[in-house]
Amino acid sequence: MRNIGKCTLLFTIGGIGYAGVEILWRQKTHFSMVIAGGICFLILDAIRRKMRGSSLVLQACVSALAITLVELAFGIIFNIIFDMNVWNYSSMPFNFLGQICPLYTALWFLLSLFIIPFAAYLGELLFGEAENCRKEPKKSKVQ
């Protein structure tokens, strides 16, 4: 039950945060971006926990790719299949289907550098997760 509450809270924070970033950046958002943001924040939290011993830069790289894949999926569903025209990156260099492009992947990387420590802070504050920057070295069995 605690996990459901944690996921619900993280989804809500991510959804509101993602929509907020979009409103600041584009002065508008769409309900699908709240859903995408919630999913992305859950994924980022999972990446943060699984890659706990890795550098923040590596975690941010993986996170940026994950967010980009979520954007691609949502773009295909909402922009291409349902023709809702939520966004269109067709004019951006090296775009794929007008749904994703390297510039926004780079921006997600930069944002992830802040979002990942924020997720760690929330994990510690709200859920009592101990956060180590690096994994403890394994102790040798031979002494």
Where are the language model's segments positioned?
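Aromatic-rich, lipid-facing transmembrane alpha helices and their immediate juxtamembrane interface loops
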Residues: 1-143
